[in-house]
Amino acid sequence: TGLAICSIAFEGARLAIRNGGWPLTPDKIKTGLESLKNYDANGLIAPITVTAQDHGGGGKTRIEMWDGEKWVAQTDWIAGFQDEVWSVVKEQSADFAKSETQK
């Protein structure tokens, strides 16, 4: 998991430099991450696409098993409970937005 997260951050920074130049800034990194399209870290993770509307990248995972020498996929990439997750995200976001306008 740590390697996967680092690879996403590294690729986002690489794209930020390629598209926005040096030095890196928070806005350039955000733009770099939001330009990830079907990035899979050479098969380490499910292909992700990050947009301004969806920073989750797709939310897919798979079950793997160690065979004594390597990790072997036991399932295809799956996105479990996405309907439930997005329902809660939208509800909580609406509640937060409402509370902010009442301040």
What is the predicted function of each stretch?
Residues 1-103:
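Extracytosolic ligand-binding ectodomains
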